[in-house]
Curated annotation (Swiss-Prot):
Localization annotation: Mitochondrion
Name of the featured protein: Putative uncharacterized protein Q0182, mitochondrial
UniProt organism field: Saccharomyces cerevisiae (strain ATCC 204508 / S288c)
Primary localization: mitochondrion
GO cellular component terms, semicolon-separated: mitochondrion
Keyword Mitochondrion: yes
Record keywords: Mitochondrion
UniProt keyword Mitochondrion, yes or no: yes
Source species, domain of life: Eukaryota
Lineage of the organism: Eukaryota, Fungi, Dikarya, Ascomycota, Saccharomycotina
């Protein structure tokens, strides 16, 4: 059975260890990247209270817990980094990076109106593609 480091390696245990090392390296570089460039301005916070009936948006059916949003976006970005750079040992050297912006938009509901608070909170993602820095 071939156990070398190249394409011919058919050792499942060795392949699993190598892939786990790659994932660990990618996670370490991702954490360093988050520490180097501050991403706090990327994440959207919950809307401010606007007064009137239901000022906090309780009837909208969405939990505005920003830490949950940050965790969700962290893992989505991690999956993007893994699937775009699974074979690259150094992520930020020469390849593109993909960053997701987590936007919270308030749009008018199409399900019939009962008042001025009849809105639907919609989450959608915007992918920003840019060249990585050295």
């Amino acid at each position: 059975m071939v156990s070398g480091p190249g394409h011919g390696s058919r050792n499942p245990e060795r392949s699993f260890i190598i892939n786990m090392k790659r994932v660990r390296m990618m996670m370490n570089s991702f954490n360093l990247f988050l520490m180097k460039y501050n991403f706090k301005m990327v994440f959207m916070v919950r809307p401010a209270p606007r007064g009137g009936a239901d000022p906090e948006g309780v009837r909208s059916g969405i939990n505005y817990n920003n830490y949950i949003n940050i965790i969700i976006i962290y893992y989505i970005m991690m999956y993007l980094f893994m699937f775009y750079n699974i074979n690259n040992y150094f992520m930020f050297n020469k390849y593109n990076m993909y960053i997701i912006f987590f936007n919270n938009y308030t749009i008018n509901s199409y399900f019939g109106g009962i008042g001025r608070h009849d809105t639907t909170k919609m989450y959608y993602f915007t992918v920003w593609r840019f060249k990585s820095f050295k």
